[in-house]
């Protein structure tokens, strides 16, 4: 009886690897079923962007309709199975992590004083910024007389839809 093994790809050592793992501010709450594959560690892996991802983020139409953001999240955060369902509170952390994974933790900024033209160079440590994002909790219902209001953060689909409507109204 012979045992057949899968052929090993000689380039497998060069495949993209996760560069960082992050804990989502929502803790994985507020995702519908089958929208997130949260590992037992509670942290999702984040891969660096590919050239295709960078080009996607430079395409105005894909940014306007939200599909570009979804494609980049699909590529860089494969544990997020449906990026349209991401609670808004997780988006900032995800994109900071993608930036760290792709370009490193330092974000160089250059500013110029409008009054004296003095130039200021500064580097922001994105790891510190990522660590300062608070964990959000929406579990406390609000009771008003006989009514009870339960809150949840909007998901990316809702936020993107509202932004498109706002853009259309401002265009008029």
Model regions and ranges:
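Long C-terminal interaction/binding lobes of large macromolecular proteins
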Residues: 1-172
């Amino acid at each position: 009886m012979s045992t057949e093994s899968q052929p090993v790809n000689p380039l497998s050592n060069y495949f993209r690897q996760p560069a960082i793992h992050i804990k989502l501010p929502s803790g994985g709450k507020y995702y519908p079923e089958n929208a997130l594959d949260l590992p037992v560690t509670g942290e999702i892996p984040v891969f660096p962007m590919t050239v295709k991802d960078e080009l996607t983020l430079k395409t105005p139409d894909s940014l306007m309709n939200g599909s570009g953001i979804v494609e980049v999240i699909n590529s860089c955060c494969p544990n997020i199975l449906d990026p349209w369902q991401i609670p808004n509170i997780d988006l900032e952390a995800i994109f900071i992590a993608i930036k760290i994974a792709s370009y490193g933790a330092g974000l160089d900024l250059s500013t110029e004083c409008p009054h004296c033209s003095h130039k200021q160079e500064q580097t922001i440590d994105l790891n510190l910024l990522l660590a300062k994002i608070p964990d959000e909790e929406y579990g406390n219902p609000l009771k008003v007389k006989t009514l009870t209001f339960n809150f949840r953060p909007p998901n990316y689909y809702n936020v993107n839809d509202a932004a498109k409507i706002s853009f259309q109204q401002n265009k008029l």
